[in-house]
Amino acid sequence: MRIVEVVDARGHENVQSTHRATFEVTRETRLTRRGDCVVAVGAMKGAADLNLRFKEAARKDNARITITIEADEVKEVVRAKGNSRLSFTHPMDLVVRRSGYVCGRTVAVGADKAASHFSRKLVEKMRDPCQKIKITLTVES
């Protein structure tokens, strides 16, 4: 089964994209320079808003999750895994982790990239507050 979820967001001048273990997309519109894992703000969805079918499929331990982050023609593809402990309860944030840590904000674990691994060309685009960013989450289980 393959389920696709699309989240629209935008850039912010304070995007750092330097965190080595996670990356985050948030519904918040403000961002301080301390938020080094945040790659997009003003998202249309948080973890709690994702489609029920997506959540159910992602809760399978053998689920493969692909996250594509696009800003115009520049994109980054991240491969991660699902986990039976994913709760998808956070109303504001979507967090992808390289580790196996799970909380209400976590939407995928075991990722092959974190914020610091994103191309600097993409990061430059993500620093533009007018830049539209499209996040596509695809789960296959």
Report each predicted region and the residues it spans.
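A generic structural signal for short beta-strands and their flanking turns/coil linkers
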Residues: 35-37, 61-67, 90-92, 105, ...
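A low-complexity, Ser/Thr/Gly/Pro-enriched, surface-exposed linker/loop concept
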Residues: 11-32, 66, 70-97
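Short, recurring structural edge motifs at helix starts
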Residues: 34-41, 54, 103-109, 123
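N-terminal intrinsically disordered, low-complexity segments enriched in P/E/S/T
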Residues: 2-6, 12-14, 22, 128-134, ...
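Short, structured patches in soluble enzyme cores that scaffold and shape functional sites
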Residues: 43, 71, 98, 111, ...
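Short, well-structured hydrophobic secondary-structure segments
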Residues: 38-79
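Solvent-exposed alpha-helices and their adjacent loops that cap or buttress functional pockets
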Residues: 29-33, 58-59, 99-101, 127
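Short, solvent-exposed interaction modules
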Residues: 49, 74-123
